[in-house]
Protein backbone atom coordinates (compact mmCIF):
# COMPACT_ATOMS: atom_id res chain seq x y z
CA UNK A 1 0.00 0.00 0.00
CA UNK A 2 2.82 2.37 0.83
CA UNK A 3 4.41 1.73 -2.54
CA UNK A 4 1.17 2.64 -4.30
CA UNK A 5 0.88 5.89 -2.31
CA UNK A 6 4.48 6.83 -3.09
CA UNK A 7 3.89 6.05 -6.74
CA UNK A 8 0.72 8.21 -6.86
CA UNK A 9 2.45 11.06 -5.03
CA UNK A 10 5.30 10.78 -7.50
CA UNK A 11 2.81 11.19 -10.35
CA UNK A 12 1.04 14.13 -8.71
CA UNK A 13 4.19 16.14 -7.96
CA UNK A 14 4.98 17.06 -11.61
CA UNK A 15 1.32 17.95 -12.21
CA UNK A 16 1.29 20.29 -9.20
CA UNK A 17 4.58 21.89 -10.23
CA UNK A 18 3.37 22.34 -13.82
CA UNK A 19 0.18 24.07 -12.69
CA UNK A 20 2.20 26.31 -10.36
CA UNK A 21 4.48 27.44 -13.20
CA UNK A 22 1.45 28.14 -15.39
CA UNK A 23 -0.03 30.33 -12.67
CA UNK A 24 3.26 32.21 -12.35
CA UNK A 25 3.29 32.86 -16.07
CA UNK A 26 -0.24 34.26 -15.93
CA UNK A 27 0.61 36.56 -13.01
CA UNK A 28 3.80 37.90 -14.60
CA UNK A 29 3.14 41.66 -15.09
CA UNK A 30 6.11 42.04 -17.45
CA UNK A 31 4.87 39.78 -20.19
CA UNK A 32 4.05 41.94 -23.20
CA UNK A 33 2.70 41.12 -26.61
CA UNK A 34 5.35 42.93 -28.64
CA UNK A 35 3.80 42.14 -32.02
CA UNK A 36 0.51 43.85 -31.10
CA UNK A 37 2.41 46.73 -29.51
CA UNK A 38 4.48 47.22 -32.68
CA UNK A 39 1.42 47.15 -34.95
CA UNK A 40 -0.44 49.59 -32.68
CA UNK A 41 2.52 51.98 -32.71
CA UNK A 42 2.79 51.86 -36.48
CA UNK A 43 -0.94 52.52 -36.88
CA UNK A 44 -0.67 55.47 -34.48
CA UNK A 45 2.30 56.87 -36.42
CA UNK A 46 0.49 56.52 -39.76
CA UNK A 47 -2.59 58.30 -38.38
CA UNK A 48 -0.50 61.20 -37.03
CA UNK A 49 1.44 61.43 -40.29
CA UNK A 50 -1.80 61.50 -42.31
CA UNK A 51 -3.31 64.20 -40.09
CA UNK A 52 -0.16 66.30 -40.53
CA UNK A 53 -0.26 65.97 -44.31
CA UNK A 54 -3.98 66.82 -44.36
CA UNK A 55 -3.36 69.93 -42.25
CA UNK A 56 -0.63 71.08 -44.60
CA UNK A 57 -2.70 70.46 -47.71
CA UNK A 58 -5.96 71.89 -46.34
CA UNK A 59 -4.47 75.40 -46.02
CA UNK A 60 -6.52 76.04 -42.90
CA UNK A 61 -3.35 76.89 -41.08
CA UNK A 62 -3.06 80.68 -40.97
CA UNK A 63 0.69 80.62 -41.49
CA UNK A 64 1.50 83.59 -43.66
CA UNK A 65 4.71 83.15 -45.57
CA UNK A 66 4.29 86.49 -47.36
CA UNK A 67 5.37 88.56 -44.37
CA UNK A 68 8.48 90.64 -44.77
CA UNK A 69 11.26 89.02 -42.77
CA UNK A 70 12.43 91.10 -39.86
CA UNK A 71 16.00 92.04 -39.26
CA UNK A 72 17.52 90.27 -36.24
CA UNK A 73 17.87 93.50 -34.22
CA UNK A 74 14.38 94.91 -34.85
CA UNK A 75 12.81 93.48 -31.71
CA UNK A 76 15.64 94.72 -29.52
CA UNK A 77 15.46 98.17 -31.14
CA UNK A 78 11.71 98.38 -30.50
CA UNK A 79 12.19 97.51 -26.82
CA UNK A 80 14.96 100.10 -26.46
CA UNK A 81 12.81 102.77 -28.15
CA UNK A 82 9.96 102.07 -25.75
CA UNK A 83 12.25 102.29 -22.75
CA UNK A 84 13.79 105.59 -23.89
CA UNK A 85 10.38 107.01 -24.85
CA UNK A 86 9.00 106.29 -21.39
CA UNK A 87 12.06 107.78 -19.74
CA UNK A 88 11.89 111.07 -21.69
CA UNK A 89 8.16 111.72 -21.20
CA UNK A 90 7.46 114.13 -18.37
CA UNK A 91 5.71 112.43 -15.52
CA UNK A 92 2.30 113.79 -14.64
CA UNK A 93 1.83 115.10 -11.17
CA UNK A 94 -0.65 113.19 -9.11
CA UNK A 95 -3.35 115.16 -7.34
Curated annotation (Swiss-Prot):
BP-aspect Gene Ontology terms: positive regulation of sodium ion export across plasma membrane; potassium ion transport; sodium ion transport
Signal peptide extent: 1-18
Cellular compartments annotated: Cell membrane
Cystine bridges: none
Alphabetical list of Gene3D superfamilies matching this protein: Single helix bin
A single MF term (Gene Ontology): sodium channel regulator activity
Principal cellular location given in the protein's record: membrane
One Pfam family named in its UniProt record: ATP1G1_PLM_MAT8
The keyword Membrane belongs to this UniProt entry's keyword annotation: yes
Reported function: Associates with and regulates the activity of the sodium/potassium-transporting ATPase (NKA) which catalyzes the hydrolysis of ATP coupled with the exchange of Na(+) and K(+) ions across the plasma membrane. Reduces the apparent affinity for intracellular Na(+) with no change in the apparent affinity for extracellular K(+). In addition to modulating NKA kinetics, may also function as a regulator of NKA localization to the plasma membrane.
Protein name, UniProt field: FXYD domain-containing ion transport regulator 6
Source organism of this protein record: Bos taurus
Gene it is expressed from: FXYD6
Amino acid sequence: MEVVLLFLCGLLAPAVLASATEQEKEKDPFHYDYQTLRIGGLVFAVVLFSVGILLILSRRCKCSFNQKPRAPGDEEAQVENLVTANATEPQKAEN
